[in-house]
């Protein structure tokens, strides 16, 4: 009888480990998409940005993206998508920002879209993509103020990046404070209240697979290094990143900072959900910090003929 109990116990443990391995593959496996073949109707040019050499062999692979030029003095905004997505996710934001004179750069993070990569690393290698993209904007548009908007993984990559210059404005949407909470929330959501019990095994496997300590993937440990005006956005119904977690991030960030908790918002495209209010809040924040010389938000209408760097 004891023999069968031991066999059953080992079988259960083996199933748990196999399940954790499967989830690890699901979470960290690459998500390539032939983005350039899509018809977007958006006047952007394809760009390949030289990567920054890191610890992994593919860290210096070029970052693929779309660049849409704005009006001179209007500012440039980097747009960074969420996990298992690509630059197309940020198109609606790019359209309204570009319509108000902002230049925009939409990128595919490594192992997403058309940017090469073997595994998603939850901000570690992705932060190098952000650094390379910000350097590209700084080098090519030296007279422009530069801001960044990131969603979920994209937000974490912005926080974990170490750009060589100060950003003028940063907007972070639906960002987890720690990788542990991100994993536990998702396990609870999909496997019920006992799901988080798998978290230690899953995090250990991820750490082994990626060669990265989980402690390196905690935005809350680095958000105070973000020396830029900050707007944090989250939804009241977000079960992936809870309101209390966003409030902790807000407390850890340095001034100047603002927070917008969207009633009814979940872990999805906040622009699609909040629509005009989202656009008004984003433009108000960016205009205040990237266009102090402007008395009103009329730059797109007044400078439509003054497209720069043609």
Could you say what each language-model-derived stretch is?
Residues 239-245:
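Conserved alpha/beta-hydrolase "acid-adjacent" motif
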Residues 225-227, 232-234, 238:
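Short beta-strand/loop motif that positions the catalytic acidic residue
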Residues 250-268:
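Catalytic histidine neighborhood in serine/cysteine hydrolases
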Residues 160-212, 221, 228, 261:
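Hydrolase active-site cap/lid region
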Residues 2-55, 66:
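An N-terminal hydrophobic leader/cap segment in hydrolases
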């Amino acid at each position: 009888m004891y023999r069968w109990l031991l066999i059953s116990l080992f079988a259960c443990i083996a199933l748990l480990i196999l399940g954790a391995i499967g989830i690890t593959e699901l979470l960290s496996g690459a998500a390539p998409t032939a983005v350039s073949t899509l018809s977007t109707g958006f006047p952007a040019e394809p760009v390949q940005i030289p990567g920054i050499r890191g610890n992994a062999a593919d860290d210096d692979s070029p970052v693929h993206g779309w660049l849409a030029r704005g009006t001179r003095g209007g500012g440039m905004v980097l747009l960074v998508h969420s996990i298992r997505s690509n630059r197309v996710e940020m198109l609606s934001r790019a359209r309204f920002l570009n319509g108000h004179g902002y230049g925009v750069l939409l990128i595919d993070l490594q192992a997403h879209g058309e940017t090469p990569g073997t595994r998603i690393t939850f901000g570690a290698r992705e932060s190098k993509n952000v650094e390379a993209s910000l350097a590209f904007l700084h080098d090519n548009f030296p007279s422009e103020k530069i801001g960044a908007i990131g969603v979920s993984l994209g937000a974490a990559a912005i926080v974990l990046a170490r750009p060589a210059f100060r950003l003028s404005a940063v907007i972070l949407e639906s960002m987890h404070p720690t990788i542990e909470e991100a994993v536990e929330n998702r396990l609870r959501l999909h496997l019920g209240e006992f799901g988080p019990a798998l978290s230690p095994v899953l995090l250990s496997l991820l750490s082994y697979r990626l060669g990265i300590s989980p402690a390196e993937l905690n935005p809350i440990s680095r958000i105070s290094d973000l020396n830029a005006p900050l707007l944090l956005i989250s939804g009241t119904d977000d079960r992936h990143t809870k309101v209390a977690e966003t409030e902790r991030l807000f407390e850890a960030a340095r001034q100047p900072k603002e927070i917008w908790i969207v009633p009814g918002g979940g872990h999805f495209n906040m622009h699609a959900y909040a629509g005009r209010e989202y656009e008004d809040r984003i433009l108000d924040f960016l205009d205040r910090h990237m266009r102090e010389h402007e008395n009103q938000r009329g730059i797109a209408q007044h400078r439509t003929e003054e497209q720069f760097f043609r």
